[in-house]
Amino acid sequence: MSEVKKIATRASYGAALVELGKKHENLVVLDADLAAATQTGVFKKEFPERHIDCGIAECNMMGIAAGLATTGKVPFASTFAMFAAGRAFEQVRNSIAYPKINVKIGATHGGISVGEDGATHQCCEDFALMRVIPGMVVACPSDDIEAKAMVEAAYEHVGPVYMRFGRLAVPVINDRPDYKFELGKGIVLREGKDLTIIANGLCVAPALEAAEKLAADGVDAKVINIHTIKPLDEELVVAAAKETGKVVT
């Protein structure tokens, strides 16, 4: 992909919270001593009275977020994916999802792209853990534009939402007039008839690159961005599989 602007979706998360915070006074942000890393420090600077640093106590943070939600607040609990989905799984399951509490979880540093932070922080199982929880929406944006749209959609959605954001800067690929984001609805980024490539998050840009390289070899690949893992856009996936006969994820 030629020279394009790159932005880390964790930075987009922080920026989106600030913009939403200006419109909605009931929006509050919680952190577990990682405001700088999760990029929610910008919200803390803008709205210090609506930011709660819970310290290195992710389980408690989820419980506090649940409590705030019962008072009419819309809390965004923010930490690394490893701690949000791993360490605090019981609280997310029992204190947030089971009673259908309106809490949004902003999980940054997902996947192996955390790099030098090491294996203890490289959470690859968060999607699997979160998607099996009844009532939990699970999503992962492909770029800055999608991340901001996702945060706004999460605020509007009534119920728990888990969002994974990345540490590394990724290309902006959705900067177009017809872009529309909707939770649970995949986006066809490239039409094709020979096979379908399905991706989300930071894998979407490489998927588009792969499709271009395949085209040079005479293979026409469809590329779908499945930004929402749950609820999955089954209709789009099945239709693409029937159309192309081959699916790569």
Question: For the regions a protein language model found, what residue spans apply to each?
Answer:
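Thiamine diphosphate
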Residues: 1-164, 169, ...
